[in-house]
Amino acid sequence: MHVLSGLKKVFLVAVVVILATSCEKEEFITGYRGTIEFGEGSCIPGIPESARKYEKFNGRVYFVEKSAADSLGEPGFLRLKLKSTSVEARNGKVNVELPAGTFVIMTEKYFVNDPEFTITLSKGEIVQKDFKIWVCTSF
């Protein structure tokens, strides 16, 4: 009887440890929180902002160090993605821990090194900002 009781306690402790360690860490000190919307279309003629249609982005979002994006440019996009922090956006929502620094926010398919999509984080700061990323499919 005591052996069975001991096994129940061990099992219960194991379950609690597994549950505690498998939970996602949502609180952090330095990082980014926001919503990312994405749209694409012809830019001939240019589509005014008010006429553009955006959707909440679902997919991988990369936080590329600005200095690396500036030096490697679009030809180095694959290497930049491999070295960058990335998270999966769901219904546009992004919540990510980042080190202090300056980052350009890019989606999986498009290199968009634009000041409009750049964030600068100081240690201990969480930037909360929403972005609308528009990609021209023709010029």
Regions found by a protein language model. Give the residues of each.
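C-terminal motif of bacterial Sec signal peptides marking the signal peptidase cleavage site
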Residues: 19-22
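Short, surface-exposed beta-strand/beta-hairpin micro-motifs centered on an aromatic residue
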Residues: 90-97
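Short beta-strand segments within Ig-like beta-sandwich modules, predominantly Fibronectin type-III
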Residues: 85-89
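Short, ordered, surface-exposed loop/turn motifs in non-cytosolic proteins
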Residues: 40-80, 100
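Bacterial N-terminal signal peptides that target proteins for export
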Residues: 1-11
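Structured interaction patches on ligand/partner-binding surfaces of diverse proteins
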Residues: 106-139
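Bacterial signal peptide processing site
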Residues: 24-26
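Structural beta-strand segments of beta-rich domains
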Residues: 28-32
